[in-house]
Curated annotation (Swiss-Prot):
This is Subtilisin-like protease SBT3.9. It comes from Arabidopsis thaliana (Mouse-ear cress). Pfam families: fn3_6 (PF17766), Inhibitor_I9 (PF05922), Peptidase_S8 (PF00082). Residues 29-106 form the Inhibitor I9 domain. InterPro entries: Peptidase_S8/S53_dom, Peptidase_S8/S53_dom_sf, Peptidase_S8_His-AS, Peptidase_S8_Ser-AS, Peptidase_S8_subtilisin-rel, Peptidases_S8_3, S8pro/Inhibitor_I9, S8pro/Inhibitor_I9_sf. Its EC number is 3.4.21.-. Residues 112-603 form the Peptidase S8 domain. Coiled coil: none annotated. It is found in: Secreted. The keyword Transmembrane helix does not apply. Residues 26-108 form a propeptide.
Length: 756
């Protein structure tokens, strides 16, 4: 799992070239989840955890050796080193909701905010109306922070909010009294879960700081994207020059380091969430996720997020980087806001001029001098032009020349290294779009598609002495560059809860320019361009900060609804949004959820699909949680209704029907947050072959009526099993268009897998 700055799909973003080397411990770490706290006193909560372990292990010494963390603020539970049989024994205790094995999570700019319309240019802009996020606190759970970055300076900041109960922890090369300020108001680190599971990290192989300081830069990049201060004249290898800032430059940032050398222990992440809830964050941002989709009740971040959301804290989290394959989406709990990644209207065209005077525009992040004209070669037998064979079969014909190769799969750094080691001067790589550009000032590496690669190959074979010139990359932005869902972005449908649409929303996550640790191999003056849903997540978190500033009384689900129902389904220029992959197609809700985030529209959505904890309880009932389990989660006696509710009635800003056979009726409720006296009419764009009827077709709101419910009757005309078809349901008052995606699959034969 060792990759570097190609930003490949294995990580949510690639930030360092490491291989974890741990000493394997005998016992494993398990999280014993007990639900809502029974005591307000944290010490009493911890004592109850010790007593439970004592009943199993038999001595105080064994308890102290076993316990890793006590979760005692946002919820109750503990992490402990247990054998498999001990974990089974403790899971059978009546007060235990779930015993969850420890999981390793992977860590998944100047132009971004202007592209989305979040500009400080006028007094009526979202940024100005929200006072740039001032007095809001965002918690970032990631790999730490590089506090010296100017993006975290506190010039112009007032006092830290009085409600803040957190603080800063000193550690290796991190002095709390020096490195924290009125902007960076919190910094803590959590590593005990990782160490308890795998032993002490080998810091010779995996350099790290035992403190909140960020070694690799992932967390620094994320935090500065959310709320970095204004910093003029920033560029990256001379490209993308402009004023760098986060989405909410006035926000207070609290950093919780739970990720080490690219990996995050679930026990550590859960402890970070517990502390953040206690400290008083208003929003949580997590650019991380499991390598495979997990059920919410066995997934650490989902457990922590449930309690955060129940306390009014929105949780924004990455969709994952396992795309473009279907059903790869992770972080699928209905109470979190799951973010996919798109490109933005910026690219870096790089001119390739052949000896026949034909110029091809590839893509690169190359800030070096012009190269050429020099020789151009295509490695024939035994390489057959395959990029992946270059390193295994060094070829002397590459010396002093630019090499053309074709990549059948996601390319690796080995191809670039092979050309450099053979004395090559540059590399032109024909491949499927992966948004994996290596920044460089010395060695030009240019990406093109297979069609353009074939054109170059024809030229090479048409002349005895092919030559080529490669110019430095340029920055191009505006309507001539279309928006696409990134190839790496994980896709729906949701394999864990198919009736819950995931992702929820998309945001720019390709070549995002933000602050970085100087240790990073891609650092250029304290900044770097990175790609991944890790980078898209803080873009959405920044918007959530601004919405929270303007609407402090809105619930997490209200904020999610406002974002989803106002999203662009075309890009800001009005052009269609495509989804990159092995073949390019028009994007659909499984690629981008409600669409591309539209911050200015989200401020005034008109109507919202709101939810409370009671709605999530109905979800738990619908997916067969027991009354006892739900009661433990909530800390109060709860009985599911009989008959059990339908998951289709969960008041989400989307409708997803995975197994339609005949007809189904579902319900939604909307709350008016726009003009008091409003009349909305429904507009239906049904999926192909699907009939959709809404009753009533008109919703009237006034001073006494702020909520209205409606039913949606859905039936199919298909006579065979189909794939998903997509449409939309929109309420409009001619000023607001409140749109939700509709996704329907007909299943005449139930639970049938068709390989044809």
């Amino acid at each position: 799992m060792s990759k570097t700055i190609l930003f490949l799909a294995l990580f949510l973003s690639i930030v360092l070239n490491v291989q974890i080397s741990f000493v394997v411990a005998e016992s494993k770490v398990y999280v014993v989840y007990l639900g809502e706290k029974e005591h307000d006193n944290p010490e009493s909560v911890t004592e109850s955890h010790h007593q439970m372990l004592w009943s199993l292990l038999g001595s105080k010494e064994a308890v102290l050796d076993s316990i890793v963390y006590s979760y005692r603020h946002g919820f109750s539970g503990f992490a402990a080193k247990l054998t498999e049989s001990q974990a089974q024994q403790i899971s059978e205790l009546p007060e235990v909701v779930q015993v969850i094995p420890n999981t390793l999570y992977e860590m998944t700019t100047t132009r971004t905010w202007d592209y989305l319309g979040v500009s400080p240019g006028n007094s009526d802009s979202l940024l100005q109306k929200a006072n740039m996020g001032y007095n809001v606190i965002v918690g970032v759970i990631d790999s730490g922070v590089w506090p010296e970055s100017e993006m975290f300076n506190d010039k112009g900041f007032g006092p830290i909010p009085s409600r803040w109960k957190g603080g800063c922890e000193s550690g290796e090369l991190f002095n709390a009294s020096i490195h924290c300020n009125r902007k960076l108001i919190g910094a803590k680190y959590f590593v005990d879960g990782l160490v308890a599971e795998f032993g002490v990290v080998n810091r010779t192989q995996n350099p790290e700081y035992l403190s909140p300081r960020d070694f690799a830069g992932h967390g620094t990049h994320v935090a500065s994207t959310i709320g970095g201060s204004f910093l003029p004249n920033v560029s990256y290898v001379g490209l993308g020059r402009g004023t760098a800032r986060g989405g909410a430059p006035g926000v207070h940032i609290a950093v919780y380091k739970a990720c080490w050398s690219g990996y995050c222990s679930g026990a550590d992440v859960l402890k970070a969430m517990d502390e953040a809830i206690h400290d008083g964050v208003d929003i949580l941002s997590l650019s991380l996720g499991p390598s495979v989709p997990l059920f919410p009740e066995t997934e650490h971040t989902s457990v922590g997020a449930f309690h955060a959301v129940a306390k009014g804290i929105p949780v924004v989290i990455a969709a994952g980087n396992a795309g473009p394959t279907a059903q790869t989406i992770s972080n699928v709990a209905p109470w979190v806001l799951t973010v996919a990644a798109t490109t933005q209207d910026r690219s870096f065209p790089t001119a390739i001029t052949l000896g026949n005077n034909i110029t091809i525009l590839g893509q690169a992040i190359y800030g070096g001098p012009e190269l050429g004209f020099v020789g151009l070669t295509y490695p024939e037998s035994p390489l057959s032009g395959d990029c992946e064979k270059l390193s295994a079969n060094p070829n002397s014909t590459m010396e002093g020349k630019v090499v053309l190769c074709f990549a059948a799969s996601t390319p690796s750094n080995a191809a670039i290294a092979a050309v450099i080691n053979a004395g090559g001067l540059g590399l032109i790589m024909a491949k499927n779009p992966t948004h994996s550009l290596t920044p460089t000032r010395k060695f030009p590496w240019v990406s093109i598609d297979f069609e353009l690669g074939t054109d170059i190959l024809f030229y090479i074979r048409s002349t005895r002495s092919p030559i080529v010139k490669i110019q430095a990359s340029k920055t191009l932005f505006g309507q001539s560059v279309s928006t696409k869902v990134a190839t790496f972005s994980s896709r729906g449908p949701n394999s864990v809860s198919p009736a819950i649409l995931k992702p929820d929303i998309a945001a720019p996550g390709v070549n995002i320019l933000a602050a970085i640790s100087p240790n990073s191999s891609i650092n250029d003056g304290g900044f770097a361009m990175m790609s991944g849903t890790s980078m898209a997540t803080p873009v959405v978190s920044g918007v959530v900060v601004l919405l929270k500033s303007l609407h402090p009384d809105w619930s997490p689900s209200a904020i999610k609804s406002a974002i989803v129902t106002t999203a662009w389904r075309t890009d800001p220029s009005g052009e269609p949004i495509f989804a990159d992959g092995s073949s390019r197609k028009l994007a659909d809700p499984f690629d981008y959820g409600g669409g591309l985030i539209n911050p200015e529209k989200a401020v005034k959505p008109g109507l919202i699909y709101d939810m409370t904890t009671d709605d999530y309880v109905m979800y738990m009932c619908s997916v067969d949680y027991s009354d006892i389990s739900i009661s433990r989660v909530l800390g109060k006696i709860t009985v599911c209704p009989n008959p059990k509710p339908s998951v289709l009635d969960l008041n989400l800003p989307s409708i997803t029907i995975p197994n339609l056979r005949g007809e189904v009726t579902l319900t939604r409720t909307v709350t008016n947050v726009g003009p008091v006296n409003s009349v909305y009419k429904v507009v239906i764009d049904p999926p192909t072959g699907i009939n959709v009827a809404v009753t009533p077709a008109e919703l009237v709101f006034d001073y006494t009526t702020t909520k209205r419910s409606f039913t949606v009757r859905v039936s199919t005309t298909h006579k065979v099993n189909t794939g998903y078809y997509f449409g939309s349901l929109t309420w409009t008052d001619n000023m607001h268009n409140v749109a939700i995606p509709v996704s329907v699959r007909t299943q005449i034969l139930q639970r049938y897998y068709d390989e044809n």
